[in-house]
Amino acid sequence: MHDHTGFKERIDEVLVRLADEEERALLGLHAELSPLSEQLRRSLACGKRIRAAFLYWGWRATGQPDCEGVIRAAAAMELVHAAACTHDDIIDDSRMRHGQLTAHAAFAANGQRSTALAMILGDLLMGYAGHVFTSCGLPGAYLARTVPLWSTLLRETMAGEFLEVLRTEARADRAPLVAESLEVARFKTAKYTVERPLHLGGTLGGGSRALLEAFSGYGLPLGEAFQLRDDLLGTFGDPARTGKSNLDDLRDAKPTALLALTVAAAGPDDRRLLAKLVGNPELGEEEAAAVRELMERCGARQQVEDMIRERIGRAGAALDLAAMPAEARSALSGLAATAADRSL
């Protein structure tokens, strides 16, 4: 059985070493870069390392053995994620992640130009991702196979973020559509969280076209399920357990499937209530409770749960048909369960 805790510790070690190396390098340039190095370390300190795990098991699914080179390559996915989170938190003005201040909120707390400094940090993290991946120690011929995939991963991730911003701003003009919400989820989360890390690992390992197609059949529905669960956590989750606000998505009128289903099922009076409350940056807990009650009452929350269950089933069916070592299959099955069952 796969020991994810032990795997996570190995990824954490790579990231701690990177933070140590970059602290020395940055402070060697100038002492005033200390806040940047400190926030870099904080940005890499937390996380479940799910994206790293998918790259690793994409590699192992090709029959390749465990090695330190692929651990370092997998750690690069966590740098991509940290960069994306840093920029996403700026866009959403989210103040908390993993129970601590986000980068721009931490810079602001120190009286610094928070948005500008956090943008620089996000760019730096993305740059480190490429460095860690290309210096992982795997053969150059293996790495060369993945070059097109890196461009694809970054393009799709930015496309998802861009579309989400556009559709959040369009909220005042018309109700969100479920299909559009899922499209954003596919680009912003499903591909860069599951499918593309699997493709990177599989391509590094020399996997067949059939295996990579199986990864898509498993990864896309699983990634959508992951985002749908995240949407539920973003509204119904306990901040003490999730480490982030359960008001931000409602305040920002995020174009989630949960909101789209709620609007579609709501009657005229409830739609007026939603128009009044959702998108209000001053929304408080009492108003949020009224929105949550409506989401429960109209069946939107249960519909999202059903969508998650259906997608997990599709992912499992695709995994069952894929040819790969038993250990890799077992690990990917376990990761699917983790993505689906994250606690509220």
What are these regions (language model features)?
Residues 1-82, 86-111, 162-179, 240-241, ...:
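Conserved N-terminal diphosphate/IPP-binding helix and adjacent helical/loop segment
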Residues 40, 44, 74-80, 150-157, ...:
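Short alpha-helical scaffolding segments that buttress acidic/His motifs in well-ordered protein cores
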Residues 53, 65-80, 144-149, 211-222:
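Alpha-helical scaffolds flanking conserved acidic
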Residues 57, 61, 86-109, 130, ...:
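Acidic, Mg2+-coordinating active-site segments of isoprenoid diphosphate-utilizing enzymes
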Residues 112-113, 120-138:
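A glycine/threonine-rich phosphate-anchoring loop and its flanking beta-alpha core
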Residues 116-118, 179-189:
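A short glycine-threonine-serine/GTX helix/turn-capping micro-motif
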Residues 133-151, 274-275:
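Transmembrane helix-loop-helix
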Residues 289-344:
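Short hairpin/turn module used for nucleic-acid contact or packing/dimerization
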